[in-house]
Every structure is written in C-alpha cells, then in structure tokens.
Amino acid sequence: MKKSFVVLLFLLLGSSAAFSQGDPGPRHGVHVAYLGETLTHPGLSIGYEKYLNEDSKFQVFIRANIGFYHHYRNNNTYMFTLETGFRRNFSSGLFLEQSLGVGYFYRQIHGDGQFTVNENGSIVEKGSLGNSFLPFVANVGLGYHFQTKKAQISPFLRPNFYWKMPFNETPNMQMTVMAGILYSFK
C-alpha cells in the first residue's frame, strides 16, 4: 500500500511538472468597467481575477469586484462581490463567460425628503444611515481578446443579476450592466 502511494504521488508530481513546462497563458487579470443599473444610473467597477488553470479553451477563475453606482435623487450603492466561474475562449478571440458568487451591498439613501416624527409629535428631517444587503450574484458575459506578447487586452460586456436579501422582508432581483476592459497578464 505504501509503495503504491509513493508511485501514485510520483506520477502526479511528474505529470504536473510536464504540464507546467509549456507556455502558460495569463495567470491574473484586472478590469476597470462602467457599472450601471441601466444606462441612467452610472457607476464604476474595479476587479481582480485569478485563473486557476492553464487551458487555453476554458479558463476557470475566481474574481473579486468593488464598485458603486449613483441613482440620481435616490441612492448611492457601494458593493463588494466574490465570484467564481468559467470562460470559454474561441480561437477567433471571442469569449463567453458565466459566474456565480456572493457579495455585500451598502445602499445610502439620499437625504432630501427623509423625515420622521419625534416623540413630542414634531416632524424633523432624518439623516441617512443606509441599508445593507447580501446579494447572490449570477452573470454572463461576452468579449474579445486582443493578444500582445506580454498581455491580453479584452473589452467585455457583462449583465449582472443580483438577488438581494433582505429587501422589505423578501428577496429582490436587480440587474446591472458592466462594460469595460479586462487586462490579463502572467
């Protein structure tokens, strides 16, 4: 048993060393993107991707994003998400991707028009403390890879779907659109 374990370990290490001798693709990526709840609520997203494999056709990744968007006369939403997914790369340069994840949203309601009634019956303006949400994230995307000798530059479009909880005691779905540039490097 011990001998077969040593042989198996040797084969696994040998195959991983042989696999890593080729020219590996990008191992990391960063993006900067427009993030908006539709086109009228503009925002910004910055993210980091770590590629977990070296397959040129299928990339498995984990991604962390921070971002915000501004809804005029309503709220500012700040967010952090962690996602994992895969990307199918075609030889033409086109790619399709999908991912799932979780995150944290902090929505700060704008202060104009928020009022409360005091214990003595007078009405006073109330400051905004904001609301927190736990979203589950699902997204799909498409883009195109432009390859250079040292990096890969990829414009992309990614609709994001969020299921926020709690939201008035029930889950609520929201969609944003992300359009940006992904810069992948070794």
Where are the regions a protein language model picked out?
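Bacterial Sec-dependent N-terminal signal peptides
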Residues: 1-26, 185
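Histidine- and/or cysteine-centered catalytic micro-motif in compact active-site loops
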Residues: 3, 65-67, 101-103
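Short coil turns and loop connectors of transmembrane beta-barrels in diderm outer membranes
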Residues: 3, 26, 54-58, 90-94, ...
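Short glycine/proline- and aromatic-enriched beta-strand/turn motifs that initiate or cap beta-hairpins
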Residues: 20-69, 184-186
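Residues that define the transmembrane beta-barrel architecture of outer-membrane proteins
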Residues: 26-28, 40-44, 58-60, 76-80, ...
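Sequence/structural signature of outer-membrane beta-barrel proteins
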Residues: 35, 39, 51, 55, ...
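Transmembrane beta-barrel strand/turn architecture of Gram-negative outer membrane proteins
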Residues: 63-66, 77-89
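Outer-membrane beta-barrel transmembrane domain signature
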Residues: 85-186
